[in-house]
């Protein structure tokens, strides 16, 4: 029988991973339940290792919490980079990217990922005429082919949101996801209304005033 070894990050202020063994292959970024001291906690698989420093005393992974990883490749690598760059415990960094309920060893939340459904978002059949300045700005942004921060400057009511909507439309047509960040919670209703007026389907809202269950449902569908 094959035995595989994995470095696991746990959500504690510890600047190291812990090696566990398993009889199955597990993808990195997957949540697992591991024995830790006298209790069982949630950990995240960081990597598969070939030759552990020592096999003595290695504990076995209790169970696999999810059918698939919590993070795509890009997100996973970004979180690894952030933990290294900011010299912060790797487990705490990883777990800061998942909802509170998914950080706990709870059967109800462990099975939650297996029951999620996707948001369906489609553009409404309505055309909006852009001003000359808006067209020029949108044209420049559409030429960007890689990550690049951009600043759109304008007073309130100058049409910045319409540019965001048009950019969102472009990516929705490519079956991609859109993340809109607002500077404060009080602005969410008006921004949400603009997007609901433009796009049909369900739009997820995620903020600190929601309950853990509400945030979990949105995170699972994103």
Where are each of the predicted segments found?
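Accessory, non-ATPase domains that flank or precede helicase/AAA+ motor cores in DNA-metabolism machines
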Residues: 1-222
